[in-house]
Amino acid sequence: MGSPRAALLMLLLRPIKLLRRRFRLLLLLAVVSVGLWTLYLELVASAQAGGNPLNHRYGSWRELAKALASRNIPAVDPNLQFYRPQRLSLKDQEIARSRSRNSSYLKWNKPVPWLSEFRGHANLHVFEDWCGSSIQQLRNNLHFPLYPHIRTTLRKLAVSPKWTNYGLRIFGYLHPFTDGKIQFAIAADDNAEFWLSRDDQVSGLQLLASVGKTGKEWTAPGEFGKFQSQISKPVSLSASLRYYFEVLHKQNDEGTDHVEVAWRRNDPGAKFTIIDSPFLSLFTNETILRMDEVGHIPQTAASHVGSSNTPPRDEQPPADMLRPDPRDTLFRVPLIAKSHLRHVLPDCPYKPSYLVDGLPLQRYQGLRFVHLSFVYPNDYTRLSHMETHNKCFYQESAYDQDRSSFQEYIKMDKPEKHGPEQPAGLEDGLLEESQYEDVPEEIPTSQDQNTGIQGRKQKTISTPGLGVTDYHLRKLLARSQSGPVAPLSKQNSTTAFPTRTSNIPVQRPEKSPVPSRDLSHSDQGARRNLPLIQRARPTGDRPGKTLEQSQWLNQVESFIAEQRRGDRIEPPTPSRGWRPEEDVVIAADQEGEVEEEEEGEDEEEDMSEVFEYVPMFDPVVNWGQTFSAQNLDFQALRTDWIDLNCNTSGNLLLPEQEALEVTRVFLRKLSQRTRGRYQLQRIVNVEKRQDRLRGGRYFLELELLDGQRLVRLSEYVSTRGWRGGDHPGREDTEARNLQGLVWSPRNRHRHVLNAQDPEPKLCWPQGFSWNHRAVVHFIVPVKNQARWVQQFIRDMESLSQVTGDAHFSIIITDYSSEDMDVEMALKRSRLRSYQYLKLSGNFERSAGLQAGIDLVKDPHSIIFLCDLHIHFPAGIIDTIRKHCVEGKMAFAPMVMRLHCGATPQWPEGYWEVNGFGLLGIYKSDLDKIGGMNTKEFRDRWGGEDWELLDRILQAGLEVERLSLRNFFHHFHSKRGMWNRRQMKMP
C-alpha cells in the first residue's frame, strides 16, 4: 500500500481524468446552453420592442406568410392585430353567467378589441313580450341583460319598431362631433335612460338623462323638454376619443313606441339633433356568436342597478305563499327508519271507491274523475292578492262580484234612541227599512228585470250606477222632511207621497221643442254651477232594483213635483246642448201631467227662478252605525272536484280538528310500539284524499325528536270506514249554514248519513308506499330556446347544490337547435347526471318526450314530464317522490302561470287548473299504458296531456292533484316557438 499522500493525490486527479475523457460532450452542452440563453434574451427584447412578426395576431398562417413575404409594406403600428370575434373560455363565460344577477358586475372588465370597421352602428339587444313601462321592470326580466331574444345593430339612436311590450338595450361607443361642452337629451314612450361613460371603459358609466321612473311618464317623438330629467348637464368631450354609452328603453302596449337620443353644443340657441351613424360604433361584433355565448356582453351599472326584485326585509311579501313555511325545507330533515314503523299499524287492503279501473272513458273525460286533496295547515296557495281582479273564490255570480255583494252577510244594529241631530221620522222609515232589514225573498218583476237578476236574491243595496243617485235623492227627501228649508216646510206631509203598488215605470209626457236662445254670460255661469239632479231610469232599465227602491223613487219624484207646484215653478225647456235624456231637473205633478211651457219673454226669468230655488243637501252619514256578523269560512263551500271556473282558490283546507285527531291516534300507536322514543316536535303537513265510502287516505308529515336528533315522518295511512269531516259538530253546522246562505237549495251539499266511529282506525295501505331513493328524471324537449335552456340548466344546478340529492337526472331531447350547443352546455355544467339526445325535423313535444322516456332503462325510476319555462321550489324532487307510488298513483302538480311582467318574487297570475302537462309517473306505469301518443299528436299539441290522463285513469291509477307552493310557469314569448313562421307586416 502507498503512502496516504499518494492516495489523496490519486483521488484529486480522478475528476480531472473524467473531464478529459468527456470534454467534447461537456463542451457541446455548454454551447447549447449559451445559445438557448441568447435566444431567450433576444425573444424577450423583441417582444418588448414589438418587432417580432410572430408576436402579431393574424387570422391564419396564410396571412402571416403573406405579411412576411411582402417587401413593400409601409411601416405600421407594430401592435396591429387582425380581428376575429373572441370566444371567451368556458370559465370566463361561467363567471359571466354567475355574475349576471349580483353586484359583481363592477368587476367586469373584459378587453374587447375595437376596430375602425365598427363605425356606423351600435349594438341592439331586444327583450320581447315583457309587460310594464318602467326601466326597473326591464331589469326584473329573468334574461336581462345576458340573454336577449334578438341581437342586432342600429344605425342611429332613434328607433320605433311599432311593436308592444318589449325592452331595448342599445350600447356601443360615441364619437363626439366636436371638442368642448355637449348636452344630451332623450325622448321616449314609455320610460328610457341614457348612460355615458367618462371614457371607453364600461366602469365609468353615469346616468345623464331619463324619461321617468314609475312607468307613467312618456313623451311625444322629439319632445325633449317635457321633463326636467330629459336634458343632461353639459359634458366635456373630446372629438379624438370614444365614449362608451348605453340606452335602456321600456315600452308597454299603448301609445306610439319610440326612443331617441339627441345632442347639441352648449351654446345659446343650439338645437338638438339625433345622434346619427357617423358618430356611432359597435362595442363588439356578435354576428358569428351563438346565443349562449355571453362573455362579451358588458355588465354595467345601467344593466344591474336596482335589478334585484326581491322585496326589502322590512317589507311584507306581495303574496302570502312567499312567506316561510316548514314545508319548504322539510326535505333537509332525515327520514325516520322504516324498521321503526313496520309494526306500528296493521296492514289493510287499499282500493279506493273513486278509481275508474277499466271503465270506458270518452276522449278527455278523465278530467272529471280527478279529485283534489285537502291540506293542513293552511299552505296559503290561495291567491288572495289576485282577488281584486278575480273574486271567484266567494262563488258569486259575475253580476254580483263587487264588494257591496257582501252586504247580505252583515246585519245592521238598530239604533237604541235618536239623538238630537238625527230625529225620528220619515228618514228612519225609508233608510232603515230599505237598507238595513233582512234580505227579502224574490218578488215578481218585469221581464226586463228578470234578465239581470234571475236566480239571485234581491239585494237591498243599490246597483252600480244607481247608488249615487238614490243616495242623494234619499238624503234630499230625509232632509226636507226635517224641515231645514223654510219655503218647503208647508209641503211636509205624508199626503204628498202616494205609494205605488206596481213597478210600472213613470211615463213622462213629451215636451214640445222650443227654439233655444242665447244666454247671457251671467245665465251661462248660473247654468254651469247648477246642481243637477240625475233623472232616475225606469225600473225596467236597471236590473236588480227592489220593490222598495222603485216605490221610493216614485215618492221622491212626487215630492219634488209638489215643491215646484207649490212655488209655481215650471220645468225648463231643453235648449241646445242640454239633452233631456241626461242630467235634468226632475219635475212632475201629483197626477203625472206637466203643462207645456209658454214661449215668450218670461222663459229666462222662469229658468233663473228654477236655478235659484233648487235646494242643495249634504248627505247624512251615520258614523256610529254598528252591525253583527257571523264567522265565514268559504272553504266550507268547496268540494274535491276540479273547479274549472276558479283558478285562484288554491288547495282545499283540511279541518284542524280532523288533522289533529288522525295525528293523535298515530302518535299514540307509535309511542306504544317504540316505548315513547319519539316526541312530536311539529305537524308540518297533513294531506287527505277523501273517500266517502271506504274511508279517507292521509299523508302525515311530522317532525319528531329522537332524543336530541330531529327526524321526520312522511308516510301514508288509511282510515277504514272513517270519513273524518262528516261527523256532526259545530264547524260542520256553521258550514251548512253558510251553504244555505250562498247555495240554492238544489245545489246544497248532500250530507252522508251513515254513522261512523268517533275515533279513526289507522292502518298501512297495502302496496301504497313511496320510495325515497327513486331516481327522478326530468325530461324536456327543446328547439332554439337558448336563453331558456341556459336558465333550466342553472335551475337544475341550483337544485343539486341546495338539496345535495344525487338521485335525479335531466334528459334534454334537442331538435337540432341552431342558437346554442346544448350538449356542450350540459358538459360544462355542474350537473352530476344528465343525458342528451339530438333529434331532427320539426319540434314535436310528444315525440320528444317519448324519445327521452326511451333513454331511461330502470323501470322503477320516476319520469317527470317537464316544461322548459318552470321555476322549481327547492323541495320539488322530494315532493315528486312522495306523491308517486309505483302501480298506484301518478302526480300532476298544479303550476302557477305568471302574468306578463310578473316574477317569482312578485307573483301575479293564476293556477293552471286544467293543465296536466307537468306529470310525474313511474317508468313501469308509463310503459304499461303505452307512453306518449306520438301518432296523433305530431305537428300539433294541446290536448296530449288530457289524452294521457284518460289512459292513466283507465289503467286504475290515481292522479294526485295539488297546488305547489313557489312552483311557477314563467311568462314567455311565443315568437319563433313551435315551428311558427314570421310574416312581414305592412
UniProtKB/Swiss-Prot annotation:
Database matches in SUPFAM superfamilies: Nucleotide-diphospho-sugar transferases
Protein name: Beta-1,4-N-acetylgalactosaminyltransferase 3
Lumenal topological segments: 46-986
Organism: Mus musculus (Mouse)
Topological domains annotated Cytoplasmic: 1-24
Superkingdom, taxonomy of origin: Eukaryota
Its membrane topology: Single-pass type II membrane protein
Compartmental location: Golgi apparatus, Golgi stack membrane
Disordered: region residues: 301-324, 434-466, 481-552
UniProt record similarity statement: Belongs to the chondroitin N-acetylgalactosaminyltransferase family.
Single GO term (MF): acetylgalactosaminyltransferase activity
Gene: B4galnt3
Keywords from the named record: Glycosyltransferase, Golgi apparatus, Membrane, Signal-anchor, Transferase, Transmembrane, Transmembrane helix
Pfam families in the cross-refs: CHGN
Biased composition (Polar residues): 301-311, 444-453, 481-505
InterPro entries listed in its UniProt record: Chond_GalNAc (IPR008428), CS_glycosyltransferase (IPR051227), Nucleotide-diphossugar_trans (IPR029044), PA14/GLEYA (IPR037524), PA14_dom (IPR011658)
Protein purpose: Transfers N-acetylgalactosamine (GalNAc) from UDP-GalNAc to N-acetylglucosamine-beta-benzyl with a beta-1,4-linkage to form N,N'-diacetyllactosediamine, GalNAc-beta-1,4-GlcNAc structures in N-linked glycans and probably O-linked glycans. Mediates the N,N'-diacetyllactosediamine formation on gastric mucosa.
PA14 domain residues: 109-278
Reactions accelerated catalytically: an N-acetyl-beta-D-glucosaminyl derivative + UDP-N-acetyl-alpha-D-galactosamine = an N-acetyl-beta-D-galactosaminyl-(1->4)-N-acetyl-beta-D-glucosaminyl derivative + UDP + H(+)
Regions that span the bilayer: 25-45
Biased composition (Basic and acidic residues): 312-324
